[in-house]
Amino acid sequence: MANDLFADAAGGRLGAQAPLPQRVRPQALDEFAGQRDVIGEGSALQRAIAEDRVGSMIFYGPPGTGKTTLARIVAHTTRAHFEELSAVQVGIADVRRVLSESEQRLGQTGQKTILFLDEIHRFNKAQQDALLPGVESGLVTLIGATTENPYFEVNSALLSRCQLFELQPLDRDDLAGVVRRGETELATTLPDEIRDEIVAAAGGDARNALNILEAAVAAAGGEPIS
């Protein structure tokens, strides 16, 4: 797996100082909130992850719906080498490096490579084209994540080689479960009406809900939140 990939996913070296969404990020499918149509028991994606046979795919949806979390759950379960890049921070040289290393690794050890590219819509056409040969040949399995409509932001040739999964904003019950998970991490229990207010304010975004919770607990300074 990519070096230090899960420092973020598990709260990392910051430990209790890491932001709450990082500290409570699900590590397995049975901890994942929402998206039952995509990842529910018996779904094609659930079976593919469980059987370690994921293909190239793109997760598309609003912030806080679980795109990065799903990719990292794949990373926790796969025997493949997992590489994570942010399209905001890398370019063609980085893509070519990953493809070259993937080819060497496959030839030397037989280990396949999964490349998670966050914010894939930030790659321009030339950068996306650089990915295409590796995806087309099966040298890498691509997992892309985007908040933008991939039919407009991802090259048609690349998109045609990926399965598209659209993630929806979390419903109130799922968000309430996320908030309760945060409460456990923060060793606090909210009144139901306060939890409901956080859920309503979060707008279907799990990360937003946890950030609101963390800010509220910090502002209370150890006093009960009311």
Question: What residue ranges belong to the model's regions?
Answer:
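C-terminal helical "lid" of AAA+/P-loop NTPase domains
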Residues: R195-A201, R207-G221
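A short, basic N-terminal segment
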Residues: M1-E51
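Conserved AAA+ ATPase "SRH/arginine-finger" region at the nucleotide-binding site
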Residues: S86-V88, Q163-A176
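Conserved catalytic/switch belt of AAA+ P-loop NTPases
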Residues: Q46-A50, L117, H121-S160
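Helix-loop-helix "sensor" segment of P-loop NTPases
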Residues: A176-R195
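A short hydrophobic beta-strand->loop->alpha-helix junction that borders the nucleotide-binding pocket
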Residues: G61-P62, E83-G91, T146-T147, L167
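Walker A/P-loop
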Residues: A2-R13, R47-L85, S100-E103, L132-S137
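Short glycine-rich substrate-engagement loop in P-loop NTPases that contacts/grips substrate
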Residues: V38-S43, A80-I114, K125
